[in-house]
Design a protein with these regions (language model features):
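Extended aliphatic helical segments
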Residues: 9-11, 58-59, 72-75, 86, ...
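Mid-chain, well-packed structural core segment of small domains
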Residues: 68-72, 77-80
Length: 128
């Protein structure tokens, strides 16, 4: 079996999957967000931002072309270890956080162990 360094897969720009320990990891500082079988966002610092801070009004008045915070919220996710912004999502107020990355870890491990897939430079590739 490959070493732990070779069993880490880059999933997003700032998020890695450590396959042997089945954990989400910040690839900037190594902070562990939690189990890879759960939503990594639960391990992040969360900032619920007023959309008017990001999308400033274009004109004065009721119809300013700035999103209404009663209709939309901007949720920012940060690494507690280094402060890197890991993700952002736009949600209706009251909507639960999106569980947008769910990897079938057992199937992935099986395909790696069978030799069908390999990890090269933190990327999955088909075996040749």
């Amino acid at each position: 079996m490959a070493s732990n360094a070779n069993r880490r897969i880059r999933v997003t720009e700032y998020l890695d999957l450590e396959l042997d320990r089945e954990q989400w990891i910040c690839n900037r500082c190594g902070h562990i967000f939690g189990s890879a079988r759960d939503n990594y966002k639960k391990g992040c610092l969360i900032h619920d931002r007023d959309p008017r801070e990001i999308h400033l009004p274009i004109v004065e008045g009721d119809y300013s072309f700035s999103p209404d915070p009663l209709w939309v919220r901007i949720v920012e996710f940060y690494c507690p270890g280094c402060g890197t912004q890991v993700d952002t999502e736009y949600l209706p107020p009251g909507h639960p956080l999106t569980h947008d990355i769910e990897i079938d870890i057992d199937a992935l491990k099986s395909r790696l162990e069978s030799g069908e897939l390999v990890i090269k430079d933190q990327r999955l590739e088909a075996a040749q």
